[in-house]
């Protein structure tokens, strides 16, 4: 099969993005472009793993399925954008599509160079989306902060890659593990630190509150969900190269085992720090977007703990499974936030006056995000804890469970504001179209969060 056929989704998305530059770019056109790319991805499915472009990309059934999931979530995002009728710029859809292109390329990348370029492609789009609300000082401030910090961490990543290349003489992902020296270890640390920044994992998380609060809510919805899923898959791809390494001229030696454990330890430590910082940083937050940002740090921590203790490159990996559940839940929660004109947590009491169904669904989503049984968020956390116990990380398993209990208190506080505080007299200002589309998304996400555990049984 022609190698360019395997790149059909990326080629299709790039061409459609360029076409939108010359059209009156609207969110409806963006949704159509994603649907066409989704069809192209179905058409380019493969039953075997294939390396293309001289080994820069690896196309496999799993990577193609991940692309389908990312594209499906992007469709939901564009429906949200259509519902609120806010794009702020005629190039809004183009920026989203180009950022999406970077995500699709990143999950297929098999060299450090291609991975770096793909990650930067989807990051640049996010920098602009953060400040796309031109008349907002907060949005401009968020965009500048995000761009400056992101550029700095980009330099850290490329410096780490250069150190790895100096020692190993190779840019494939397996080059992370075929050498063993202090310079090589520093290179790995710098490279992984850049990826940790992209997913807002501790200790590279301080930016997230200001960016989530300052960016337009539509933009926040985009980079709060999709980049995390794609980058978690990237991290799992790095780990999967350790088990066992099939590399020409190399054997699975003591040095390789030391490097693999070193990478796992970085992710594991970051996971613990993320849960700790995320759990306690979310306390006392009064802005709902800021709260979601800090709470997401803890969720990333659970993902990293799952990734660091499993090399399974599949949806059965605890880190990827957690990321999927997190994405579903957050899409529903942020759909509710899109309905709110005032992003203060106390404004959530308006939900019950305006739409009792949305208020109920929102509370169910909060329970799922908190990890309350029997919601699917509980099972994703339990899966991570089970993996920790099986790998003899008992203290960390206990710590993660205690952190989950603590986080349930502030989720309960928001549920109280939504359902048990005196109702406001005014309703949420939204057209019928807003309510119809966003309510549908919220209810569907809530149903999945409530009854999704049935899928685990079967």
UniProtKB/Swiss-Prot annotation:
Keyword Membrane: yes
Compartment annotation: Cell inner membrane
Alphabetized GO MF terms: NADH dehydrogenase (ubiquinone) activity; NADH:ubiquinone reductase (non-electrogenic) activity; quinone binding
Entry EC no(s): 7.1.1.-
Family: Belongs to the complex I subunit 2 family.
Membrane topology of the entry: Multi-pass membrane protein
InterPro entries: NADH-Q_OxRdtase_suN/2, ND/Mrp_TM
Protein name: NADH-quinone oxidoreductase subunit N
Top EC class of this enzyme: translocase
Subunit structure: NDH-1 is composed of 14 different subunits. Subunits NuoA, H, J, K, L, M, N constitute the membrane sector of the complex.
Species of provenance: Neorickettsia risticii (strain Illinois)
Gene Ontology CC: plasma membrane
Gene name, Swiss-Prot/TrEMBL: nuoN
Gene Ontology BP annotations: ATP synthesis coupled electron transport
Recorded superkingdom: Bacteria
Keywords of the record: Cell inner membrane, Cell membrane, Membrane, NAD, Quinone, Translocase, Transmembrane, Transmembrane helix, Transport, Ubiquinone
Known role: NDH-1 shuttles electrons from NADH, via FMN and iron-sulfur (Fe-S) centers, to quinones in the respiratory chain. The immediate electron acceptor for the enzyme in this species is believed to be ubiquinone. Couples the redox reaction to proton translocation (for every two electrons transferred, four hydrogen ions are translocated across the cytoplasmic membrane), and thus conserves the redox energy in a proton gradient.
Transmembrane segments: 3-23, 29-49, 64-84, 92-112, 147-167, 188-208, 222-242, 265-285, 291-311, 320-340, 358-378, 394-414, 437-457
Catalytic reactions of this protein: a quinone + NADH + 5 H(+)(in) = a quinol + NAD(+) + 4 H(+)(out)
């Amino acid at each position: 099969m022609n190698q360019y056929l395997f790149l059909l989704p990326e080629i299709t998305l790039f061409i459609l993005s360029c076409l939108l530059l010359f059209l009156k770019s609207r969110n409806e056109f963006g949704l159509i472009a994603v649907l066409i790319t989704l069809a192209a991805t179905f058409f380019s499915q493969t039953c075997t793993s294939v390396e293309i472009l001289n080994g820069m990309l690896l196309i496999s059934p799993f990577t193609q399925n991940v692309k389908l999931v990312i594209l499906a979530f992007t469709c939901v995002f564009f429906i949200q954008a259509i519902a609120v009728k806010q794009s702020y710029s005629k190039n809004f859809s183009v920026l989203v599509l180009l950022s999406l292109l970077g995500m699709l390329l990143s999950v297929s990348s098999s060299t450090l160079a291609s991975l770096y370029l793909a990650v930067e492609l989807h990051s640049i789009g996010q920098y602009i989306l953060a400040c796309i609300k031109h008349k907002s000082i907060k949005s401009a401030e968020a965009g500048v902060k995000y761009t400056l910090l992101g550029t700095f961490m980009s330099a850290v990543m490329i410096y780490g890659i250069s150190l790895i290349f100096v020692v190993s003489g190779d840019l494939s992902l397996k080059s992370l593990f075929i050498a063993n020296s202090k310079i090589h270890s520093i290179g790995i640390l710098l490279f992984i630190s850049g990826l940790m920044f992209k997913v807002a994992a501790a200790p590279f998380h301080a930016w997230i509150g200001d960016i989530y609060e300052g960016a337009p809510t539509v933009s926040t919805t985009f980079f709060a969900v999709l980049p995390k899923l794609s980058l978690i898959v990237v991290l799992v791809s790095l780990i999967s190269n350790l088990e066992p390494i099939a590399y020409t001229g190399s054997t699975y030696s003591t040095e390789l085992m030391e490097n693999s454990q070193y990478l796992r330890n970085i992710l594991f430590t970051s996971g613990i720090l993320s849960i700790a910082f995320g759990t306690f940083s979310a306390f006392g937050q009064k802005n709902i977007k800021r709260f979601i940002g800090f709470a997401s740090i803890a969720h990333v921590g659970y993902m990293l703990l799952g990734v660091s203790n499993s090399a399974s490159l599949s949806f059965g990996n605890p880190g990827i499974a957690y990321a999927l559940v997190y994405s579903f839940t957050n899409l529903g929660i942020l759909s509710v936030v899109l309905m709110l004109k005032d992003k203060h947590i106390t404004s959530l009491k308006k939900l019950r006056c305006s739409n009792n169904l949305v208020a109920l669904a929102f509370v169910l989503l909060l329970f799922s995000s908190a990890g309350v049984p029997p919601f699917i968020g509980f099972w994703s956390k339990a899966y991570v804890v089970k993996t920790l116990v099986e790998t003899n990380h008992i203290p960390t398993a206990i710590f993660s469970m205690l952190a989950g209990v603590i986080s349930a208190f502030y989720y309960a506080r928001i549920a109280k504001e939504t359902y048990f505080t005196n109702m406001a007299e005014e309703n949420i200002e939204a057209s019928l179209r807003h309510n119809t589309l966003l309510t549908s998304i919220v209810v569907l996400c809530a149903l999945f969060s409530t009854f999704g555990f049935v899928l685990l049984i079967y």
